[in-house]
A protein has these predicted regions:
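C-terminal cap of thioredoxin/glutaredoxin-like
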Residues: 1-11, 15, 93-171
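Structural alpha/beta surface segment adjacent to cysteine/selenocysteine redox centers
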Residues: 2-97, 107-108
Length: 171
Protein backbone atom coordinates (compact mmCIF):
# COMPACT_ATOMS: atom_id res chain seq x y z
CA UNK A 1 0.00 0.00 0.00
CA UNK A 2 2.77 2.53 0.60
CA UNK A 3 3.86 2.22 -3.04
CA UNK A 4 0.28 2.67 -4.27
CA UNK A 5 -0.10 5.74 -2.07
CA UNK A 6 3.15 7.23 -3.37
CA UNK A 7 2.11 6.59 -6.97
CA UNK A 8 -1.30 8.17 -6.38
CA UNK A 9 0.27 11.23 -4.77
CA UNK A 10 2.94 11.65 -7.42
CA UNK A 11 1.11 10.69 -10.62
CA UNK A 12 -2.58 10.72 -9.73
CA UNK A 13 -3.32 13.72 -11.93
CA UNK A 14 -1.76 11.97 -14.98
CA UNK A 15 -2.34 8.31 -14.15
CA UNK A 16 -5.36 7.81 -11.93
CA UNK A 17 -5.25 4.90 -9.51
CA UNK A 18 -8.10 2.39 -9.60
CA UNK A 19 -8.28 0.16 -6.55
CA UNK A 20 -9.57 -3.35 -7.31
CA UNK A 21 -10.19 -5.74 -4.45
CA UNK A 22 -8.90 -9.26 -5.02
CA UNK A 23 -10.49 -11.27 -2.21
CA UNK A 24 -7.31 -12.86 -0.84
CA UNK A 25 -9.08 -15.13 1.67
CA UNK A 26 -12.69 -14.43 0.75
CA UNK A 27 -15.34 -16.83 1.97
CA UNK A 28 -13.10 -18.73 4.37
CA UNK A 29 -15.18 -20.41 7.07
CA UNK A 30 -12.58 -22.47 8.93
CA UNK A 31 -10.63 -21.02 11.89
CA UNK A 32 -6.91 -20.50 11.35
CA UNK A 33 -4.83 -23.50 12.38
CA UNK A 34 -1.47 -23.16 14.13
CA UNK A 35 0.51 -23.95 10.97
CA UNK A 36 -1.23 -21.19 9.03
CA UNK A 37 -0.71 -18.77 11.91
CA UNK A 38 3.02 -19.52 11.76
CA UNK A 39 3.12 -18.91 8.00
CA UNK A 40 1.29 -15.60 8.50
CA UNK A 41 3.65 -14.67 11.35
CA UNK A 42 6.63 -15.28 9.05
CA UNK A 43 5.06 -13.23 6.27
CA UNK A 44 4.31 -10.38 8.68
CA UNK A 45 7.93 -10.44 9.92
CA UNK A 46 9.21 -10.08 6.34
CA UNK A 47 6.76 -7.26 5.61
CA UNK A 48 7.82 -5.49 8.80
CA UNK A 49 11.52 -5.80 7.85
CA UNK A 50 10.93 -4.33 4.40
CA UNK A 51 8.30 -1.68 5.11
CA UNK A 52 8.36 -0.97 8.85
CA UNK A 53 4.64 -1.82 8.98
CA UNK A 54 3.75 -2.42 12.65
CA UNK A 55 1.95 -5.63 13.61
CA UNK A 56 0.15 -6.49 16.83
CA UNK A 57 1.04 -10.12 17.40
CA UNK A 58 -1.82 -10.59 19.87
CA UNK A 59 -3.68 -11.57 16.71
CA UNK A 60 -2.10 -15.02 16.95
CA UNK A 61 -3.67 -15.63 20.36
CA UNK A 62 -7.18 -15.67 18.89
CA UNK A 63 -8.34 -19.25 19.36
CA UNK A 64 -11.01 -19.54 16.69
CA UNK A 65 -10.40 -16.63 14.33
CA UNK A 66 -11.78 -17.10 10.80
CA UNK A 67 -9.59 -15.10 8.40
CA UNK A 68 -12.20 -14.02 5.84
CA UNK A 69 -11.21 -10.94 3.83
CA UNK A 70 -14.58 -10.75 2.07
CA UNK A 71 -16.16 -8.30 4.54
CA UNK A 72 -13.22 -5.88 4.41
CA UNK A 73 -13.14 -6.03 0.59
CA UNK A 74 -16.84 -5.22 0.56
CA UNK A 75 -16.27 -2.31 2.96
CA UNK A 76 -13.63 -0.81 0.65
CA UNK A 77 -15.95 -1.21 -2.34
CA UNK A 78 -18.75 0.45 -0.35
CA UNK A 79 -16.40 3.34 0.47
CA UNK A 80 -15.46 3.58 -3.21
CA UNK A 81 -19.17 3.83 -4.04
CA UNK A 82 -19.44 6.79 -1.65
CA UNK A 83 -16.34 8.55 -3.00
CA UNK A 84 -13.82 6.81 -5.28
CA UNK A 85 -10.93 8.83 -3.90
CA UNK A 86 -11.65 7.40 -0.43
CA UNK A 87 -11.03 3.76 -1.35
CA UNK A 88 -7.26 3.78 -0.76
CA UNK A 89 -7.41 5.77 2.53
CA UNK A 90 -10.15 3.42 3.78
CA UNK A 91 -8.08 0.37 2.86
CA UNK A 92 -5.13 1.90 4.70
CA UNK A 93 -7.31 2.50 7.75
CA UNK A 94 -8.56 -1.08 7.71
CA UNK A 95 -5.00 -2.39 7.41
CA UNK A 96 -3.94 -0.25 10.37
CA UNK A 97 -6.91 -1.46 12.41
CA UNK A 98 -6.26 -5.13 11.62
CA UNK A 99 -2.48 -5.36 11.58
CA UNK A 100 -1.39 -2.71 14.08
CA UNK A 101 -4.41 -2.49 16.41
CA UNK A 102 -5.59 -6.14 16.35
CA UNK A 103 -9.16 -5.09 15.50
CA UNK A 104 -11.44 -7.77 14.07
CA UNK A 105 -12.30 -6.39 10.65
CA UNK A 106 -14.08 -9.60 9.74
CA UNK A 107 -16.86 -8.36 12.04
CA UNK A 108 -19.41 -6.27 10.14
CA UNK A 109 -20.12 -3.99 13.12
CA UNK A 110 -16.43 -3.19 13.56
CA UNK A 111 -16.01 -2.58 9.83
CA UNK A 112 -19.03 -0.33 9.54
CA UNK A 113 -17.98 1.73 12.57
CA UNK A 114 -14.39 2.16 11.34
CA UNK A 115 -15.29 3.11 7.78
CA UNK A 116 -18.27 5.29 8.67
CA UNK A 117 -16.08 7.28 11.05
CA UNK A 118 -13.35 7.59 8.43
CA UNK A 119 -15.84 8.82 5.81
CA UNK A 120 -17.73 11.09 8.20
CA UNK A 121 -20.99 9.17 7.72
CA UNK A 122 -23.37 7.73 10.27
CA UNK A 123 -22.99 4.02 10.87
CA UNK A 124 -26.58 3.54 9.72
CA UNK A 125 -25.94 5.29 6.39
CA UNK A 126 -22.69 3.47 5.68
CA UNK A 127 -24.31 0.19 6.77
CA UNK A 128 -26.99 0.68 4.11
CA UNK A 129 -24.33 1.14 1.44
CA UNK A 130 -22.32 -1.83 2.74
CA UNK A 131 -25.42 -4.07 2.77
CA UNK A 132 -26.67 -3.01 -0.68
CA UNK A 133 -26.89 -5.73 -3.33
CA UNK A 134 -25.04 -3.39 -5.72
CA UNK A 135 -22.08 -3.28 -3.34
CA UNK A 136 -21.94 -7.07 -3.13
CA UNK A 137 -22.14 -7.41 -6.92
CA UNK A 138 -19.44 -4.77 -7.43
CA UNK A 139 -17.22 -6.58 -4.91
CA UNK A 140 -17.63 -9.86 -6.81
CA UNK A 141 -16.90 -7.94 -10.01
CA UNK A 142 -13.61 -6.79 -8.49
CA UNK A 143 -12.68 -10.37 -7.61
CA UNK A 144 -13.44 -11.49 -11.16
CA UNK A 145 -11.41 -8.64 -12.68
CA UNK A 146 -8.43 -9.49 -10.45
CA UNK A 147 -8.62 -13.12 -11.63
CA UNK A 148 -8.92 -12.04 -15.28
CA UNK A 149 -5.84 -9.84 -14.87
CA UNK A 150 -3.90 -12.81 -13.50
CA UNK A 151 -3.33 -11.34 -10.05
CA UNK A 152 -1.72 -13.99 -7.83
CA UNK A 153 -0.39 -11.94 -4.91
CA UNK A 154 -1.40 -8.86 -2.99
CA UNK A 155 -0.94 -6.02 -3.35
CA UNK A 156 -0.37 -5.99 -7.10
CA UNK A 157 0.20 -2.81 -9.08
CA UNK A 158 -0.64 -2.96 -12.78
CA UNK A 159 -0.01 -0.08 -15.16
CA UNK A 160 -2.32 0.40 -18.12
CA UNK A 161 -1.36 2.42 -21.16
CA UNK A 162 -3.87 2.42 -23.96
CA UNK A 163 -4.73 -1.27 -24.38
CA UNK A 164 -1.64 -2.79 -22.78
CA UNK A 165 -1.10 -3.84 -19.17
CA UNK A 166 2.15 -4.31 -17.29
CA UNK A 167 2.58 -5.75 -13.80
CA UNK A 168 4.76 -3.36 -11.80
CA UNK A 169 4.75 -5.20 -8.48
CA UNK A 170 3.03 -8.32 -7.22
CA UNK A 171 2.73 -9.49 -3.63
Amino acid sequence: LPSAKRLAERYGDRAPLSLVMGGLHCGTQVPLEDGMKERIRGHWARVHEVTGQPFDEAFFERASFVYDTGPSCRAVVAARRVAPECALPVLERLHQAFYAENRDITDEGTLVALVAEHLGLSEARFGEIYDAEETLLETYGDFELARELGVRGFPTLIARKDCSLEVLTQG
